[in-house]
């Protein structure tokens, strides 16, 4: 990159000499290519942004965003990776952006942050998001049941789509009825659908 800097300076100092300004842009482009080869994507992005109209700079810029996003994804920076993929609009960027969201959801699930996992799994077109979301609802349902929040438990179980949880719903309703048998019968019966 240093040799390109020297060439750029030399052409800049050439003033209006024949093709000097074109050579500055060409050297700048070559410097960006060298930075990409060295995987210095931030520097390459910065340079390519100044010469977007030259040759295939826009395509190269998109590749830089994409490659930078891949690095961010690999390092677990899912939000930043998602943004960078979307900025790239390159190759399979939408699928890769969905992967970022999915991996973030997996992380939430692993940390038992089921509510945020559900929000992240909301992309129904990627992998097995619906099934993963179901696991979150089941975990929340079990948690609520354990805490004797039976109505809440049933509400979570009723959101499960792909798995038969009818027994868990019935158990939750029964537990709710037993817990509220001394409460106003009308409220309990209305909830139970009777």
Spell out what each predicted region is:
Residues 24, 61, 97, 133, ...:
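Residues that mark the junctions of alpha-helical repeat units in TPR/alpha-solenoid scaffolds
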Residues 7, 14-15, 50-52, 87-89, ...:
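Alpha-helical solenoid scaffolds that mediate protein-protein interactions
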């Amino acid at each position: 990159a240093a040799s390109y800097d020297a060439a750029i300076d030399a052409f800049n100092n050439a003033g209006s000499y024949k093709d000097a300004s074109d050579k500055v842009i060409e050297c700048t482009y070559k410097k960006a290519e060298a930075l990409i080869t060295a995987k210095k994507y931030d520097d390459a992005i910065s340079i390519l942004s100044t010469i977007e109209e030259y040759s295939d700079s826009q395509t190269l810029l998109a590749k830089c965003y994409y490659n930078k996003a891949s690095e961010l994804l690999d390092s677990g920076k899912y939000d930043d990776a998602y943004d960078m993929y979307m900025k790239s609009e390159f190759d399979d960027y939408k699928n890769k952006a969905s992967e970022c969201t999915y991996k973030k959801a997996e992380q939430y699930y692993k940390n038992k942050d089921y509510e945020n996992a559900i929000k992240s799994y909301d992309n129904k077109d990627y992998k097995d998001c619906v099934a993963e979301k179901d696991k979150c609802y089941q975990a929340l349902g079990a948690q609520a049941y354990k805490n004797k929040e039976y109505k809440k438990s049933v509400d979570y179980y009723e959101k499960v789509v792909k798995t038969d949880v009818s027994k868990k719903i019935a158990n939750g309703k029964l537990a709710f009825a037993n817990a509220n048998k001394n409460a106003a019968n009308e409220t309990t019966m209305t909830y139970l659908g009777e």
